[in-house]
């Protein structure tokens, strides 16, 4: 099991990266975390989501792409569709296992199983009236798996973390009210 799987649940408070803004998609408010590109962005985003930093990016790339390479016959047809060409086992190793080619739907679907995560990819585009719109691609491992939300815009993945600031403030206010009620009860019982 990859490092950090059991221990880490991402929130904006424990990511070792600055957020680069907010975005509202459907009814959810997300913080956006940009990651380095260069063909590694999805692996960087997955590492940031699972461990809170980028330290496992190459490990995740190696685990995911080696699984495909080692079972190439099983994934070959899917690879032809996702890589838009007949890719040989040798070429796959050079481009994906040891290289820095972008991940495709094949690598993402394998990542869900290896990283035991549901991966939601939000594709940012424009509708017929030039309004920003989003399309969601879901890669599901299981209903019990953690959810990782990614934004894909201009061929670059960014991590999305649900912004729970409002929920945290509400929770704090609720706790403060409960505390003051208890304090008042104690005061009046004296």
Predicted region positions:
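Active-site-proximal helix-loop elements at catalytic-domain edges
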Residues: 1-13
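Deubiquitinase catalytic domains
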Residues: 97-190
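Papain-like cysteine protease catalytic cores
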Residues: 11-133
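N-terminal low-hydrophobic presequence detector
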Residues: 1-3, 49, 190
């Amino acid at each position: 099991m990859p490092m950090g799987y059991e221990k880490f649940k991402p929130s904006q408070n424990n990511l070792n990266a600055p957020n680069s803004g907010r975005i509202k998609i459907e009814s959810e408010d997300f913080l956006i975390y940009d990651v380095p590109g260069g063909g590694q962005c999805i692996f960087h985003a997955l590492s940031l989501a699972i461990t809170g930093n980028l330290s496992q990016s190459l490990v995740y790339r190696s685990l995911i792409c080696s699984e495909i390479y080692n079972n190439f016959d099983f994934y070959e047809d899917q690879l032809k569709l996702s890589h838009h060409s007949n890719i040989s086992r040798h070429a796959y190793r050079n481009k994906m296992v040891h290289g820095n080619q972008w991940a495709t739907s094949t690598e993402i679907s394998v990542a869900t199983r290896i990283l035991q995560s549901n991966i939601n990819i939000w594709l940012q585009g424009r509708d017929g009236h030039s309004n920003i719109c989003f399309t969601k691609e879901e890669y599901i491992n299981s209903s019990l798996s953690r959810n990782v939300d990614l934004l894909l815009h201009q061929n670059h993945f960014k991590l999305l973390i649900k912004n729970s600031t409002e929920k945290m403030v509400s929770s704090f206010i609720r706790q403060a009210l409960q505390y003051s009620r208890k304090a008042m009860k104690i005061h009046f019982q004296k």
